[in-house]
Structure formats: C-alpha cells, structure tokens
Amino acid sequence: MSVTTIKDPRDVVLAPVVSEKSYGLIDEGKYTFLVDPRSNKTEIKLAVEKIFSVKVDSINTINRAGKRKRTKFGWGQRKSTKRAIVTLKEGTIDIFGGPLA
C-alpha cells in the first residue's frame, strides 16, 4: 500500500532559472525552473499547472551536481540542484511579473 502526501506546489517549484539559454527557450514555449530534488515529473507538472494556470505538454528534468570549489580550508562543494524544463501546450507564463521600470 502506498501512502501519498500532498505537497504544496510552492515546495516543488522553487524559482525560475534566469540565464541566456532559458530566455532563448521561452520563445519555443519552454520554461526552466529550479525544483525540489526529491520531486518527480508528475509532481512538477501538477505544481506548474496549479501555480500558473496553464496546461503542460511535457517535462524534462536535469540533475546538476554541485561544483567542487577550493576554499581557504580545503575543498568544498556547491549545492547540487535539479532543474525542470517545462513545455506548455498553449499560453505563456509571466515569470517576471510586475510593471517594467
């Protein structure tokens, strides 16, 4: 018997990714988000549909290992992240909402 817990969508989708590559994908109807590393594609799809009121066509996920960095005291490591590239069926997401200055 599996027990499912209902996650808050804001705990699944953490933030949009702001980069040149993600800006280029927006023209194709693809949006990139940082997501919780423990979440799966189904949870990500439900969260995006609930938060932004859009229909999701597909989800591609990427697990990125944290970079190894030299510190004063030896070697450290940056945090590992998971990204989701969300393709919409139709419509757009206003990621950077608010008026432009």
Swiss-Prot record:
Record text on subunit structure and interactions: Part of the 50S ribosomal subunit. Contacts protein L29, and trigger factor when it is bound to the ribosome.
Annotated signal peptide: none
Protein name: Large ribosomal subunit protein uL23
Pfam families hit by this protein: Ribosomal_L23
GO molecular function: rRNA binding; structural constituent of ribosome
Keyword RNA-binding (UniProt): yes
Keyword terms: Ribonucleoprotein, Ribosomal protein, RNA-binding, rRNA-binding
Family statement drawn from the similarity comment of this UniProt entry: Belongs to the universal ribosomal protein uL23 family.
Entry's Gene Ontology BP terms: translation
Record carries keyword Oxidoreductase: no
